[in-house]
Protein backbone atom coordinates (compact mmCIF):
# COMPACT_ATOMS: atom_id res chain seq x y z
CA UNK A 1 0.00 0.00 0.00
CA UNK A 2 2.85 2.40 0.78
CA UNK A 3 5.49 1.08 -1.63
CA UNK A 4 7.18 3.93 -3.46
CA UNK A 5 5.47 6.68 -1.47
CA UNK A 6 7.61 9.55 -0.17
CA UNK A 7 7.08 10.52 3.46
CA UNK A 8 8.77 13.53 5.04
CA UNK A 9 8.98 13.42 8.83
CA UNK A 10 9.64 16.62 10.75
CA UNK A 11 10.98 16.21 14.29
CA UNK A 12 11.12 19.05 16.84
CA UNK A 13 12.57 19.35 20.33
CA UNK A 14 10.58 17.06 22.61
CA UNK A 15 11.30 14.03 24.76
CA UNK A 16 8.96 12.13 22.42
CA UNK A 17 11.37 12.63 19.50
CA UNK A 18 12.96 9.22 20.05
CA UNK A 19 9.65 7.51 19.20
CA UNK A 20 9.83 8.78 15.63
CA UNK A 21 12.70 6.37 14.99
CA UNK A 22 10.17 3.55 15.39
CA UNK A 23 7.76 5.28 13.01
CA UNK A 24 10.51 5.75 10.42
CA UNK A 25 11.40 2.07 10.72
CA UNK A 26 7.76 1.02 10.25
CA UNK A 27 7.49 3.12 7.10
CA UNK A 28 10.76 1.86 5.64
CA UNK A 29 9.60 -1.73 6.17
CA UNK A 30 6.58 -0.86 4.00
CA UNK A 31 9.06 0.29 1.31
CA UNK A 32 8.39 3.99 1.79
CA UNK A 33 11.01 6.54 0.80
CA UNK A 34 11.42 8.28 4.18
CA UNK A 35 13.19 11.60 4.72
CA UNK A 36 13.68 13.20 8.13
CA UNK A 37 14.14 16.89 8.92
CA UNK A 38 15.06 17.87 12.47
CA UNK A 39 15.16 21.17 14.29
CA UNK A 40 18.39 21.98 16.09
CA UNK A 41 16.67 21.44 19.46
CA UNK A 42 15.50 17.98 18.37
CA UNK A 43 19.12 16.86 17.99
CA UNK A 44 19.48 17.22 21.76
CA UNK A 45 16.97 14.38 22.22
CA UNK A 46 17.98 11.99 19.42
CA UNK A 47 21.06 11.85 17.19
CA UNK A 48 20.43 12.45 13.46
CA UNK A 49 22.59 9.39 12.75
CA UNK A 50 19.75 7.19 14.06
CA UNK A 51 17.43 8.45 11.33
CA UNK A 52 20.14 8.29 8.67
CA UNK A 53 20.78 4.66 9.55
CA UNK A 54 17.08 3.78 9.39
CA UNK A 55 16.17 5.71 6.23
CA UNK A 56 19.43 5.58 4.25
CA UNK A 57 19.05 9.33 3.67
CA UNK A 58 20.89 12.26 5.19
CA UNK A 59 18.92 13.75 8.07
CA UNK A 60 18.52 17.46 7.35
CA UNK A 61 18.96 20.05 10.09
CA UNK A 62 20.84 23.02 8.68
CA UNK A 63 19.34 24.89 5.71
CA UNK A 64 22.85 25.90 4.65
CA UNK A 65 24.66 22.56 5.04
CA UNK A 66 27.68 22.87 2.68
CA UNK A 67 28.32 19.12 2.78
CA UNK A 68 24.96 18.24 1.26
CA UNK A 69 24.40 17.87 -2.50
CA UNK A 70 22.72 21.08 -3.70
CA UNK A 71 19.13 20.72 -4.88
CA UNK A 72 17.64 23.61 -2.89
CA UNK A 73 16.87 20.86 -0.41
CA UNK A 74 13.75 22.32 1.19
CA UNK A 75 12.13 22.78 -2.24
CA UNK A 76 13.12 19.39 -3.67
CA UNK A 77 11.86 17.53 -0.60
CA UNK A 78 8.67 19.57 -0.50
CA UNK A 79 7.96 18.68 -4.12
CA UNK A 80 8.70 14.97 -3.64
CA UNK A 81 6.54 14.45 -0.57
CA UNK A 82 3.28 12.51 -0.77
CA UNK A 83 2.64 13.47 2.84
CA UNK A 84 4.48 15.41 5.52
CA UNK A 85 4.12 14.67 9.21
CA UNK A 86 5.57 16.85 11.97
CA UNK A 87 5.80 14.77 15.14
CA UNK A 88 6.44 15.67 17.83
CA UNK A 89 5.32 19.19 16.99
CA UNK A 90 6.34 21.79 19.56
CA UNK A 91 4.40 24.96 20.32
CA UNK A 92 7.20 26.79 18.52
CA UNK A 93 6.81 25.02 15.14
CA UNK A 94 3.02 25.27 15.41
CA UNK A 95 3.31 29.04 15.85
CA UNK A 96 5.75 29.32 12.93
CA UNK A 97 3.46 27.43 10.56
CA UNK A 98 0.40 29.36 11.68
CA UNK A 99 2.08 32.70 10.93
CA UNK A 100 4.17 31.82 7.89
CA UNK A 101 7.58 31.99 9.53
CA UNK A 102 10.31 30.12 7.65
CA UNK A 103 13.59 30.45 9.53
CA UNK A 104 14.98 26.91 9.56
CA UNK A 105 15.01 23.80 7.38
CA UNK A 106 11.82 22.31 8.81
CA UNK A 107 9.62 25.41 8.73
CA UNK A 108 10.89 26.33 5.25
CA UNK A 109 10.16 22.88 3.85
CA UNK A 110 6.73 22.77 5.48
CA UNK A 111 5.71 26.09 3.94
CA UNK A 112 6.99 24.99 0.51
CA UNK A 113 5.20 21.64 0.68
CA UNK A 114 1.84 21.36 -1.09
CA UNK A 115 1.20 17.79 0.08
CA UNK A 116 -1.07 17.00 3.02
CA UNK A 117 0.50 17.95 6.35
CA UNK A 118 -0.22 16.09 9.59
CA UNK A 119 0.72 17.79 12.85
CA UNK A 120 1.10 15.90 16.14
CA UNK A 121 1.43 18.37 19.06
CA UNK A 122 3.51 17.28 22.05
CA UNK A 123 4.07 19.61 24.99
CA UNK A 124 3.18 20.43 28.58
CA UNK A 125 -0.57 20.30 29.22
CA UNK A 126 -0.72 23.98 30.23
CA UNK A 127 1.12 24.98 27.06
CA UNK A 128 -1.24 22.86 24.97
CA UNK A 129 -4.31 24.37 26.61
CA UNK A 130 -2.98 27.93 26.28
CA UNK A 131 -5.46 29.91 24.14
CA UNK A 132 -2.62 31.14 21.92
CA UNK A 133 -1.57 27.58 21.06
CA UNK A 134 -5.20 26.57 20.50
CA UNK A 135 -5.72 29.57 18.21
CA UNK A 136 -2.63 28.58 16.23
CA UNK A 137 -3.89 25.00 15.88
CA UNK A 138 -7.20 26.32 14.58
CA UNK A 139 -5.32 28.35 11.98
CA UNK A 140 -3.57 25.17 10.84
CA UNK A 141 -6.92 23.39 10.61
CA UNK A 142 -8.22 26.28 8.52
CA UNK A 143 -5.42 25.60 6.05
CA UNK A 144 -6.34 21.90 5.85
CA UNK A 145 -3.58 20.56 8.07
CA UNK A 146 -4.68 17.54 10.07
CA UNK A 147 -4.12 17.80 13.81
CA UNK A 148 -3.51 14.59 15.75
CA UNK A 149 -5.07 15.07 19.16
CA UNK A 150 -2.48 14.40 21.87
CA UNK A 151 -2.99 11.55 24.28
CA UNK A 152 -3.83 12.16 27.92
CA UNK A 153 -1.47 10.84 30.57
CA UNK A 154 1.57 11.43 32.74
CA UNK A 155 3.91 13.91 31.04
CA UNK A 156 7.70 14.16 31.25
CA UNK A 157 7.38 17.44 33.17
CA UNK A 158 5.46 15.66 35.93
CA UNK A 159 2.02 17.01 35.06
CA UNK A 160 -0.89 14.84 34.01
CA UNK A 161 -3.18 15.79 31.13
CA UNK A 162 -3.33 16.24 27.35
CA UNK A 163 0.04 16.71 25.68
CA UNK A 164 1.51 13.24 25.10
CA UNK A 165 2.37 12.37 21.52
CA UNK A 166 0.43 9.25 20.47
CA UNK A 167 2.38 6.05 19.93
CA UNK A 168 4.09 5.46 16.55
CA UNK A 169 1.44 2.89 15.60
CA UNK A 170 -1.24 5.59 15.83
CA UNK A 171 0.80 8.06 13.77
CA UNK A 172 1.37 5.33 11.19
CA UNK A 173 -2.40 4.93 10.78
CA UNK A 174 -2.72 8.66 10.01
CA UNK A 175 -0.13 8.34 7.25
CA UNK A 176 -1.76 5.17 5.96
CA UNK A 177 -5.14 6.90 5.76
CA UNK A 178 -3.69 9.74 3.77
CA UNK A 179 -1.61 7.98 1.11
CA UNK A 180 -2.32 4.23 1.08
CA UNK A 181 -5.08 4.33 -1.56
CA UNK A 182 -6.61 6.39 -4.31
CA UNK A 183 -9.61 8.23 -2.82
CA UNK A 184 -12.15 6.87 -5.31
CA UNK A 185 -14.85 6.64 -2.61
CA UNK A 186 -14.40 10.17 -1.32
CA UNK A 187 -17.76 11.78 -0.61
CA UNK A 188 -19.54 8.44 -0.22
CA UNK A 189 -21.23 7.49 3.03
CA UNK A 190 -20.98 3.75 3.65
CA UNK A 191 -22.51 1.75 6.48
CA UNK A 192 -21.00 -1.67 7.19
CA UNK A 193 -22.32 -4.26 9.62
CA UNK A 194 -20.05 -6.90 11.12
CA UNK A 195 -19.81 -9.66 13.69
CA UNK A 196 -22.42 -11.78 15.46
CA UNK A 197 -25.42 -10.86 17.55
CA UNK A 198 -26.14 -12.33 20.98
CA UNK A 199 -29.67 -13.26 22.09
CA UNK A 200 -29.93 -13.76 25.85
CA UNK A 201 -31.47 -16.88 27.38
CA UNK A 202 -30.74 -15.74 30.94
CA UNK A 203 -28.07 -13.53 32.56
CA UNK A 204 -25.44 -16.21 31.89
CA UNK A 205 -26.27 -17.81 28.54
CA UNK A 206 -27.05 -16.55 25.05
CA UNK A 207 -27.56 -17.78 21.50
CA UNK A 208 -24.92 -16.65 18.99
CA UNK A 209 -22.84 -17.87 16.04
CA UNK A 210 -19.19 -18.25 15.00
CA UNK A 211 -18.80 -14.89 13.24
CA UNK A 212 -15.59 -13.04 14.16
CA UNK A 213 -16.34 -9.84 12.23
CA UNK A 214 -13.10 -10.04 10.22
CA UNK A 215 -14.80 -9.64 6.83
CA UNK A 216 -16.85 -6.63 7.87
CA UNK A 217 -13.91 -4.95 9.57
CA UNK A 218 -11.80 -5.48 6.44
CA UNK A 219 -14.51 -3.83 4.33
CA UNK A 220 -14.77 -0.89 6.74
CA UNK A 221 -10.99 -0.39 6.74
CA UNK A 222 -10.62 -0.52 2.97
CA UNK A 223 -13.58 1.81 2.45
CA UNK A 224 -12.06 4.28 4.92
CA UNK A 225 -8.66 4.14 3.22
CA UNK A 226 -10.36 4.81 -0.12
CA UNK A 227 -11.87 7.99 1.26
CA UNK A 228 -15.39 6.98 2.31
CA UNK A 229 -17.16 8.27 5.41
CA UNK A 230 -17.69 4.91 7.12
CA UNK A 231 -20.03 3.83 9.90
CA UNK A 232 -19.34 0.35 11.31
CA UNK A 233 -22.21 -1.28 13.20
CA UNK A 234 -20.52 -4.12 15.06
CA UNK A 235 -21.61 -6.99 17.23
CA UNK A 236 -19.34 -8.20 20.04
CA UNK A 237 -15.97 -9.16 18.53
CA UNK A 238 -12.36 -9.49 19.68
CA UNK A 239 -11.04 -7.04 17.08
CA UNK A 240 -9.54 -3.60 17.59
CA UNK A 241 -11.74 -0.72 16.40
CA UNK A 242 -11.06 0.44 12.85
CA UNK A 243 -9.31 3.85 12.98
CA UNK A 244 -11.14 6.88 11.56
CA UNK A 245 -14.44 4.98 11.37
CA UNK A 246 -17.58 5.75 13.37
CA UNK A 247 -18.11 2.70 15.56
CA UNK A 248 -21.64 1.74 16.66
CA UNK A 249 -21.50 -1.23 19.08
CA UNK A 250 -24.56 -3.47 19.32
CA UNK A 251 -25.40 -6.73 21.06
CA UNK A 252 -28.76 -8.08 19.88
CA UNK A 253 -30.45 -8.35 16.50
CA UNK A 254 -32.91 -5.69 17.66
CA UNK A 255 -30.00 -3.38 18.54
CA UNK A 256 -28.58 -3.87 15.07
CA UNK A 257 -31.96 -3.28 13.42
CA UNK A 258 -32.38 0.01 15.26
CA UNK A 259 -28.83 1.14 14.44
CA UNK A 260 -29.11 0.25 10.76
CA UNK A 261 -32.66 1.45 10.15
CA UNK A 262 -31.93 4.68 12.02
CA UNK A 263 -28.70 5.44 10.17
CA UNK A 264 -29.35 4.07 6.69
CA UNK A 265 -31.44 6.97 5.31
CA UNK A 266 -28.30 9.17 5.35
CA UNK A 267 -26.08 6.53 3.69
CA UNK A 268 -25.21 5.97 0.04
CA UNK A 269 -24.28 2.32 0.50
CA UNK A 270 -25.05 -0.43 3.02
CA UNK A 271 -22.81 -3.51 3.14
CA UNK A 272 -24.35 -5.96 5.57
CA UNK A 273 -21.83 -8.66 6.43
CA UNK A 274 -22.98 -9.25 10.03
CA UNK A 275 -24.25 -12.69 11.01
CA UNK A 276 -27.53 -11.71 12.63
CA UNK A 277 -29.63 -14.17 14.63
CA UNK A 278 -32.82 -15.21 12.83
CA UNK A 279 -34.41 -16.28 16.12
CA UNK A 280 -34.28 -15.23 19.78
CA UNK A 281 -35.72 -16.73 22.97
CA UNK A 282 -39.37 -15.73 23.33
CA UNK A 283 -38.86 -15.35 27.09
CA UNK A 284 -35.63 -14.21 28.75
CA UNK A 285 -35.19 -15.31 32.35
CA UNK A 286 -34.14 -12.65 34.86
CA UNK A 287 -32.34 -15.33 36.88
CA UNK A 288 -29.94 -18.07 35.86
CA UNK A 289 -31.88 -21.11 34.65
CA UNK A 290 -30.97 -24.04 36.90
CA UNK A 291 -30.26 -27.52 35.60
CA UNK A 292 -33.11 -30.00 36.14
CA UNK A 293 -33.76 -33.64 35.37
CA UNK A 294 -34.98 -34.32 31.86
CA UNK A 295 -34.84 -32.23 28.71
CA UNK A 296 -35.44 -28.53 28.37
CA UNK A 297 -37.01 -26.74 25.42
CA UNK A 298 -36.54 -23.06 24.61
CA UNK A 299 -39.30 -21.35 22.66
CA UNK A 300 -37.88 -19.10 19.93
CA UNK A 301 -39.40 -16.21 18.00
CA UNK A 302 -38.32 -14.52 14.79
CA UNK A 303 -36.13 -11.43 14.89
CA UNK A 304 -36.75 -8.52 12.54
CA UNK A 305 -35.44 -9.11 9.01
CA UNK A 306 -33.03 -6.18 8.70
CA UNK A 307 -32.17 -6.62 5.03
CA UNK A 308 -35.80 -7.20 4.13
CA UNK A 309 -36.84 -3.99 5.87
CA UNK A 310 -34.03 -1.91 4.36
CA UNK A 311 -34.68 -3.34 0.89
CA UNK A 312 -38.29 -2.21 1.06
CA UNK A 313 -37.42 1.29 2.29
CA UNK A 314 -34.32 2.18 0.29
CA UNK A 315 -34.15 5.10 -2.13
CA UNK A 316 -33.52 4.36 -5.83
CA UNK A 317 -29.99 5.79 -5.70
CA UNK A 318 -28.94 3.78 -2.62
CA UNK A 319 -27.05 0.49 -2.98
CA UNK A 320 -27.51 -2.48 -0.67
CA UNK A 321 -25.05 -5.37 -0.55
CA UNK A 322 -25.89 -8.44 1.50
CA UNK A 323 -23.96 -11.59 2.39
CA UNK A 324 -25.04 -15.19 2.03
CA UNK A 325 -23.17 -18.01 3.75
CA UNK A 326 -24.38 -21.40 2.58
CA UNK A 327 -23.46 -25.05 2.94
CA UNK A 328 -25.36 -26.23 -0.15
CA UNK A 329 -27.02 -24.77 -3.26
CA UNK A 330 -25.04 -21.57 -2.74
CA UNK A 331 -25.83 -19.83 -6.02
CA UNK A 332 -29.50 -20.79 -6.07
CA UNK A 333 -30.14 -19.82 -2.45
CA UNK A 334 -28.18 -16.58 -2.76
CA UNK A 335 -30.00 -15.48 -5.90
CA UNK A 336 -33.34 -16.11 -4.15
CA UNK A 337 -32.19 -13.91 -1.27
CA UNK A 338 -31.06 -11.20 -3.69
CA UNK A 339 -34.50 -11.04 -5.30
CA UNK A 340 -36.62 -11.48 -2.16
CA UNK A 341 -34.85 -8.75 -0.19
CA UNK A 342 -34.51 -6.29 -3.12
CA UNK A 343 -30.71 -6.24 -2.96
CA UNK A 344 -28.37 -4.79 -5.57
CA UNK A 345 -25.58 -7.24 -4.80
CA UNK A 346 -25.03 -10.31 -2.68
CA UNK A 347 -21.68 -11.80 -1.66
CA UNK A 348 -21.99 -15.57 -1.45
CA UNK A 349 -19.59 -18.07 0.05
CA UNK A 350 -19.64 -21.73 1.01
CA UNK A 351 -18.79 -22.52 4.62
CA UNK A 352 -17.49 -25.94 3.59
CA UNK A 353 -14.76 -24.52 1.36
CA UNK A 354 -11.27 -24.47 2.87
CA UNK A 355 -10.14 -20.94 3.72
CA UNK A 356 -13.62 -19.45 3.39
CA UNK A 357 -15.97 -18.61 6.22
CA UNK A 358 -15.70 -17.80 9.89
CA UNK A 359 -12.46 -16.92 11.66
CA UNK A 360 -10.11 -17.10 8.67
CA UNK A 361 -8.02 -14.29 7.21
CA UNK A 362 -9.00 -15.41 3.71
CA UNK A 363 -12.24 -15.86 1.82
CA UNK A 364 -13.50 -17.16 -1.49
CA UNK A 365 -16.70 -15.53 -2.65
CA UNK A 366 -18.98 -15.09 -5.62
CA UNK A 367 -20.46 -11.66 -6.32
CA UNK A 368 -24.04 -12.00 -7.53
CA UNK A 369 -26.07 -9.16 -9.04
CA UNK A 370 -29.28 -9.21 -11.05
CA UNK A 371 -27.42 -9.68 -14.33
CA UNK A 372 -24.25 -11.59 -13.55
CA UNK A 373 -22.14 -13.74 -11.25
CA UNK A 374 -18.45 -13.09 -10.66
CA UNK A 375 -16.47 -15.81 -8.89
CA UNK A 376 -13.27 -14.78 -7.12
CA UNK A 377 -10.26 -16.87 -6.23
CA UNK A 378 -9.22 -17.50 -2.63
CA UNK A 379 -7.68 -14.25 -1.36
CA UNK A 380 -7.21 -12.22 1.79
CA UNK A 381 -10.31 -10.62 3.26
CA UNK A 382 -8.90 -7.15 2.57
CA UNK A 383 -8.49 -8.12 -1.10
CA UNK A 384 -12.06 -9.44 -1.12
CA UNK A 385 -13.17 -6.15 0.44
CA UNK A 386 -11.57 -4.20 -2.40
CA UNK A 387 -13.24 -6.44 -5.00
CA UNK A 388 -16.62 -5.80 -3.37
CA UNK A 389 -16.03 -2.04 -3.22
CA UNK A 390 -14.82 -1.97 -6.85
CA UNK A 391 -17.97 -3.78 -7.96
CA UNK A 392 -20.23 -1.45 -5.98
CA UNK A 393 -18.40 1.59 -7.38
CA UNK A 394 -19.10 0.37 -10.91
CA UNK A 395 -22.76 -0.18 -10.04
CA UNK A 396 -22.95 3.30 -8.53
CA UNK A 397 -21.60 4.86 -11.73
CA UNK A 398 -24.34 3.12 -13.74
CA UNK A 399 -27.17 4.23 -11.40
Regions found by a protein language model. Give the residues of each.
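A cross-family phosphate/adenosyl-ligand binding-site feature
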Residues: 1-118, 124-213, 217-399
Amino acid sequence: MLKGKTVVLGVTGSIAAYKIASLASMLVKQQCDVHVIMTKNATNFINPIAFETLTNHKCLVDTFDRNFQFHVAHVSLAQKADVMMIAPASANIIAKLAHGIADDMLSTTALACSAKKIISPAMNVHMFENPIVQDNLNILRKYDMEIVEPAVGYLACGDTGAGKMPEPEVLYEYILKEIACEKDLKGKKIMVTAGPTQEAIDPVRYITNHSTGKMGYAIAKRAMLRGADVTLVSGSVALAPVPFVKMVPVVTAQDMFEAVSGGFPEQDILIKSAAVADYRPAVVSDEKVKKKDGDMAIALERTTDILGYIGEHKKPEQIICGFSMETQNMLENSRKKLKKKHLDLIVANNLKEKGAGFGTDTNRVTLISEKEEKSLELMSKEEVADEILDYILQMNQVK
